């Protein structure tokens, strides 16, 4: 019996070593192996290489570099034009909107337009996303015009990279560039939800709220992870293919930043046994008040979340610094 148990234990160790070796091999191949994605990549660049001109309101033209940022007043339309080459035969143009309404014209014909004015429930601007304009070889030699309009100074005058090629190839390039961060966000979201459920289950099983004598509370840590992952998904460049309503996810991104100090305060209060509870409670009231005021301004279309975001960022930084100081004091005290 002892020999059988020893052999089974040896098998377990072999399994652990084997799995670590397989994981190591996989990581080695990804870091140092051949990049097989290149075999499917287009042979030519999908970045549009033609010249763009900014047609200003005073009638003058200025050749501009793309991507770039230029001085345009909020609410004013920035008009960009380029002449398609004589041998043009691509099927799509694309540009990323940064909280901008976008219109594509080929010749004098409106080919594509994007605006959430009639579909969004609140806010002043359209959510950022990639806009595709279909083209054909018949458009060779014609003038392509792009009109950009935003109603906030944060993104007024911003011109993002312009892509030209097959729509699938453009999406592949975008996915290869930004896909990994989206996968990481989903992983953190799954881990955060698991932590919340695990923390709630522990409280239910042991009939305690973990308020005394516990250094780690799974639930609040899970909420921090969930809110962080939702922020990452809201910032994802490919969010328009993740959800049907990208505007809601974009707004949720800012909401998470505004409310994220709360679970951090709850966690810090728990591990310090309520030592600074009154202070944390007052800070929590300020966080909630900022959320309510910002939401009212957003719903009434007075200011977008992006315009009130600096206040939330300052609160978050203040909470981080305060909690860090208190935790250092707490750790120093318990180590004495």
What are these regions (language model features)?
Residues 3-86:
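Extended carbohydrate-recognition surfaces in non-catalytic/accessory domains of CAZymes
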Residues 43-56, 100-110, 162:
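Extended low-complexity, serine/threonine- and proline-enriched intrinsically disordered segments
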Residues 60-67, 110-129:
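Solvent-exposed beta-strand/loop surfaces of large extracellular or lumenal domains
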Residues 73, 86-88, 124-126, 137-139:
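Surface-exposed coil/turn segments at beta-strand junctions on protein surfaces, enriched
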Residues 75-83, 90-92, 130-132, 141-143:
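Intrinsic-disorder/low-complexity, polar/charged segments enriched in Ser/Thr/Lys/Arg/Asp/Glu/Gln
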Residues 86-106, 144-146:
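Aromatic-lined ligand-binding clefts that engage carbohydrates, nucleic acids, or primary amines
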Residues 126-185:
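An acidic-aromatic loop/edge-strand motif
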Residues 182-336:
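Juxtamembrane segments at transmembrane-helix boundaries
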């Amino acid at each position: 019996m002892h020999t059988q148990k020893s052999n089974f234990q040896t098998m377990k160790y072999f399994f652990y070593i084997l799995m670590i070796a397989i994981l190591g091999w996989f990581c080695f191949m990804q870091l140092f192996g051949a990049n097989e994605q290149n075999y499917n990549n287009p042979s030519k660049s999908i970045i549009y290489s033609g010249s763009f001109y900014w047609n200003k309101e005073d009638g003058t033209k200025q050749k501009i570099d793309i991507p770039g940022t230029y001085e345009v007043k909020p609410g004013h339309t920035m008009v960009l034009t380029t002449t398609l080459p004589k041998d043009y035969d691509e099927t799509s143009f694309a540009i990323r909107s940064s909280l901008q309404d976008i219109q594509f014209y080929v010749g004098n014909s409106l080919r594509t337009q994007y605006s959430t004015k009639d579909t969004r429930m609140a806010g002043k601007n359209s959510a950022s996303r990639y806009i595709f304009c279909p083209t054909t070889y018949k458009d060779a030699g014609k003038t392509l015009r792009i009109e950009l309009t935003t109603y906030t100074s944060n993104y007024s005058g911003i011109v993002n990279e312009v892509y030209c090629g097959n729509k699938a190839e453009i999406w592949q390039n975008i996915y290869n560039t930004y896909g990994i961060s989206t996968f990481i966000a989903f992983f953190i979201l799954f881990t955060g939800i698991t932590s919340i459920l695990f923390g709630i289950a522990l409280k239910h099983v042991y009939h305690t709220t973990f308020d005394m004598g516990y250094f780690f509370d799974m639930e609040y840590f899970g909420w921090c992870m969930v809110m962080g992952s939702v922020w990452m998904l809201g910032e994802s460049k490919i969010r328009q293919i993740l959800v049907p309503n990208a505007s809601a996810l974009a707004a949720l991104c800012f909401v998470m930043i505004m409310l994220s100090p709360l679970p951090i305060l709850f966690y810090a209060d728990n591990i310090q046994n309520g030592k600074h509870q009154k202070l944390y409670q007052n800070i929590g009231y300020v966080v909630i008040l900022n959320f309510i005021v910002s939401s009212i301004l957003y719903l009434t279309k007075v200011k977008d979340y992006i315009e009130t975001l600096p206040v939330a960022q300052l609160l978050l930084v203040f909470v981080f610094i305060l909690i860090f100081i208190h935790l250092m004091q707490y750790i120093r005290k318990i180590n004495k």
